[in-house]
Amino acid sequence: MVSKKQKLSPISLNQNIDYKDIDLLTLFVTEQGKILPRRATGVTVQQQRRLAKAIKRARVLSLFPFVASNSI
């Protein structure tokens, strides 16, 4: 049986996920502006829910872009 390597979460279990912390939120978003899935980031279910809410909140308040800028 092949065991899967468990990914370490980039945030601790007790760390507060805040919509104003743009540096933290950018770790969980692709270059196109999509929210990364839980299996790619290694966070828990509760952390993923809080991250998604924080990213969406930051987008609505114009702190975080909905899509990436097209800089050519």
From Swiss-Prot:
Q: Print the keywords alphabetically.
A: Chloroplast, Plastid, Ribonucleoprotein, Ribosomal protein, RNA-binding, rRNA-binding
Q: Where is the signal peptide?
A: none
User: What GO molecular function terms would the record report?
Assistant: small ribosomal subunit rRNA binding; structural constituent of ribosome
Family matches, as InterPro entries: Ribosomal_bS18, Ribosomal_bS18_CS, Ribosomal_bS18_sf
Classify the source by domain of life. Answer: Eukaryota
- Please state where this protein is localized: Plastid, Chloroplast
Q: Name one GO biological process term.
A: translation
One GO term of the cellular component aspect? chloroplast
Q: State the family it belongs to.
A: Belongs to the bacterial ribosomal protein bS18 family.
Record text on subunit structure and interactions: Part of the 30S ribosomal subunit.
Name under which the protein is recorded? Small ribosomal subunit protein bS18c
Q: What is the lineage of its organism?
A: Eukaryota, Sar, Stramenopiles, Ochrophyta, Bacillariophyta
Q: Its gene?
A: rps18
